[in-house]
């Protein structure tokens, strides 16, 4: 896949500024798109948009297809008289997910009651048409969420056996008893997709493409695992027998045990990879390009026995990545995927990526810990430039935070390397812009930078600490924090490096 020479910014919608505790798909999102356009940017990258649960991670979602109701802008519904909005005193600059949960769900339910009382015939018709059109995933998701609520939030594999096993009589009775709750969860999805669709149309009108993010694995407690246990390695109780993760390495003696159930690739292949085709189809309704997290798992994945508390006991198991991407190519033509190819990357993984012409990733924070052979140093990027260069990702510290904890060797090497590229800095606060300049100067077709680096923020603005169970995903922009001066500086840098 060929990318234009361009740049973009990474900002998850929850991080947008505004009232009511979390960024939403409203005027602040449109303001950000206009800022990006003025700055000369052509891409907006987001994290996964699915509904989040315990831990608030976008990478552990209740659904592979649904959108996050937290992102719904309630102000248009308040203007229609469906809901009254009162800010309970949300903090500025951070998402308080406990407070958000306690406020937003009741507000959404009030909006649903208002909709039922006051909606026009056209709106009712539009909602009914959405439910019918999306029934192939929406029915399972809405019932899953309604049942979850009815069972105190318990994961599906701890529900009563007839519901766990999806016995026909139990499902029929649940749909009848919980019809209002099911309709409510369908309503939240209608609102989400309507608002996201309007935002995507605005991005397209401004010449901005949206890069989405898709986790390779799905969460154990998700509608898909409940509805299609045959796709996963589960026992009779519906619990995973083997789980996903990565092996021990330099950074972790015990590796990482993510806990996601692993696919039964033989079953998915027999079904023509229909789950993956539909997943990608849905993603491409939302985005123009899709970054797939942990791309190496399509070549081989680390399989950990579910009984093991760490990732040490795992083993590599081959996956049918080539067959899957051939099928994707048949269906979509060009494969609109960016490969997150970080971590344990073998020649086989590189061959799979290159066979389908998928752009990989380069992270500048990884470039300075050894010598000139480091593949993250820009002079080592492939001449075709089919890579996306980042200062850091959501899993990294901010660039200023990283620099403050870098070794003296890394700092000295970085300063020398930047000087070789004609880039100098005096204060540590200038380091994020120096690295952004380096990425812009490189042959990488696309450069994408976290907004925290545009603002030269420290570790207090870090989005995620991998392995830390709580306190992540909370950083937010303050109103007016991104200024026209930031935009002008980005535009000048893009113009000087031929990225406009």
Curated annotation (Swiss-Prot):
<dbReference type="InterPro" id="IPR017853">
    <property type="entry name" value="Glycoside_hydrolase_SF"/>
</dbReference>
<dbReference type="GO" id="GO:0005975">
    <property type="term" value="P:carbohydrate metabolic process"/>
</dbReference>
<dbReference type="Pfam" id="PF02446">
    <property type="entry name" value="Glyco_hydro_77"/>
</dbReference>
<protein>
    <recommendedName>
        <fullName>4-alpha-glucanotransferase</fullName>
        <ecNumber>2.4.1.25</ecNumber>
    </recommendedName>
</protein>
<comment type="similarity">
    <text>Belongs to the disproportionating enzyme family.</text>
</comment>
<keyword id="KW-0808">Transferase</keyword>
<dbReference type="GO" id="GO:0004134">
    <property type="term" value="F:4-alpha-glucanotransferase activity"/>
</dbReference>
<keyword id="KW-0119">Carbohydrate metabolism</keyword>
<dbReference type="GO" id="GO:0005737">
    <property type="term" value="C:cytoplasm"/>
</dbReference>
<dbReference type="InterPro" id="IPR003385">
    <property type="entry name" value="Glyco_hydro_77"/>
</dbReference>
<keyword id="KW-0963">Cytoplasm</keyword>
<keyword id="KW-0328">Glycosyltransferase</keyword>
């Amino acid at each position: 896949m060929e990318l234009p020479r361009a740049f973009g910014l990474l900002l998850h919608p929850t991080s947008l500024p505004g009232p009511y505790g979390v960024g939403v798909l409203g005027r602040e999102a449109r303001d950000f798109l206009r800022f990006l356009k003025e700055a000369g940017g052509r891409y907006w990258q987001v994290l996964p948009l699915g509904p989040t649960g315990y831990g608030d991670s976008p990478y552990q979602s209740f659904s592979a297809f649904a959108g996050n109701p937290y992102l719904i802008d309630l102000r248009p519904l308040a203007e229609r008289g469906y809901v009254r909005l009162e800010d309970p005193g949300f903090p500025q600059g951070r998402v308080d997910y406990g407070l958000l949960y306690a406020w937003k769900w009741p507000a959404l339910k009030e909006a649903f009651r208002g909709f039922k009382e006051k909606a026009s015939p056209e709106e009712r018709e539009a909602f009914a048409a959405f439910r019918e059109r999306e029934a192939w995933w929406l029915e399972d998701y809405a019932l899953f969420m309604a049942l979850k609520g009815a069972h105190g939030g318990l994961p599906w594999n701890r529900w009563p056996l007839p519901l766990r096993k999806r016995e026909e009589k139990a499902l029929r009775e649940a749909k009848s008893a919980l019809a209002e709750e099911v309709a409510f969860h369908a309503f939240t999805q209608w609102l989400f997709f309507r608002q996201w669709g309007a935002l995507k149309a605005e991005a397209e009108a401004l010449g901005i493409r949206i890069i989405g993010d898709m986790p390779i694995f799905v969460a154990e407690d998700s509608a898909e695992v409940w509805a299609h246990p045959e796709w996963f390695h589960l026992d009779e109780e519906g619990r995973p027998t083997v789980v996903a993760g990565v092996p021990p390495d330099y950074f972790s003696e015990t590796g990482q045990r993510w806990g996601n159930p692993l696919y039964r690739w033989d079953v998915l292949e027999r079904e023509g990879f229909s789950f993956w085709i539909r997943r990608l189809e849905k993603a491409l309704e939302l985005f123009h390009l899709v970054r797939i997290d942990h791309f190496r798992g399509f070549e081989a994945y680390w399989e950990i026995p579910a009984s093991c508390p760490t990732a040490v006991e795992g083993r590599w198991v081959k996956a049918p990545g080539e067959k899957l991407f051939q099928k994707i190519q048949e269906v979509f033509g060009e494969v609109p995927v960016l490969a997150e190819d970080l971590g344990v990357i073998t020649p086989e993984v590189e061959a799979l990526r290159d066979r389908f012409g998928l752009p990989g990733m380069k992270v500048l924070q990884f470039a300075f810990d050894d010598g000139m052979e480091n593949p993250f140093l820009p002079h080592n990027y492939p001449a075709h430039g089919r890579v996306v260069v980042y200062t850091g990702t959501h899993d990294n510290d901010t660039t200023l935070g990283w620099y403050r904890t870098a070794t003296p060797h890394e700092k000295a090497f970085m300063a020398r390397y930047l000087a070789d590229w004609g880039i100098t800095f005096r204060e540590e606060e200038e380091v994020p812009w120096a690295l952004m300049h380096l990425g812009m100067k490189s042959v990488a077709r696309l450069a994408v930078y976290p907004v925290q680096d545009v603002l030269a923020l420290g570790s207090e603005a870090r989005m995620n600490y991998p392995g830390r169970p709580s306190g992540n995903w909370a950083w937010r922009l303050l109103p007016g924090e991104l200024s026209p001066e930031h935009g002008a500086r980005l535009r000048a840098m893009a113009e000087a490096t031929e990225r406009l």
